[in-house]
């Protein structure tokens, strides 16, 4: 993968993260929580309507998670723009370390909470970032050999 393509893919993944986080925050602010109610219900199959996003605790956790996603997306975008663009090895290392740390802790805790499906949902999200980094790293290594 060309470096410019990897940069565009990482910017896209960052913006997608920001949008997903903003959707969670807006759901809390507006009270339009139905899409997230379905999402949480899907975490604990079968789809039976038992999970919700209605209590104060659930709403504040959604707000916190959304804010963290927005913050991570902004940070990933800045790392991509100011570090990865000029130093793909360093920028890729920073992003990869953060993403793998998130993936392992989030997935392990989700599994422990009985929401094993979240591990499956986390995986494509992780790959949105890791695939461009890895393919660019592989291309750079092949060009330098």
Regions found by a protein language model. Name each.
Residues 1-3, 137-145:
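Short, charged juxtamembrane terminal tails flanking transmembrane helices
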Residues 19-60:
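Membrane-helix boundary elements
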Residues 27, 53-59, 77-90:
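Short juxtamembrane and helix-loop transition motifs at transmembrane-helix boundaries
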Residues 43-44, 124-136:
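Alpha-helical transmembrane segments and their membrane-interface exit regions
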Residues 104-121:
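Membrane-helix boundary connector in multi-pass membrane proteins
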């Amino acid at each position: 993968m060309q470096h410019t393509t990897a940069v565009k893919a990482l910017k896209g993944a960052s913006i997608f993260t920001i949008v997903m986080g903003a959707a969670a925050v807006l759901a809390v602010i507006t009270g339009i929580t139905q899409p997230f109610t379905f999402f949480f219900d899907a975490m604990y199959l079968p789809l039976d309507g038992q999970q919700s996003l209605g209590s104060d605790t659930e709403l504040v956790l959604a707000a916190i998670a959304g804010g963290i996603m927005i913050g991570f997306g902004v940070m990933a975008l800045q790392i991509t723009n100011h570090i990865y663009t000029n130093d793909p090895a360093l920028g890729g290392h920073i992003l990869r370390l953060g993403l793998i740390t998130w993936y392992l802790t989030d997935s392990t805790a989700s599994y422990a909470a009985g929401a094993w499906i979240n591990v499956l949902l986390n995986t494509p999200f992780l790959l949105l970032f890791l695939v461009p980094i890895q393919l660019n790293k592989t291309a750079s290594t092949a060009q330098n050999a």
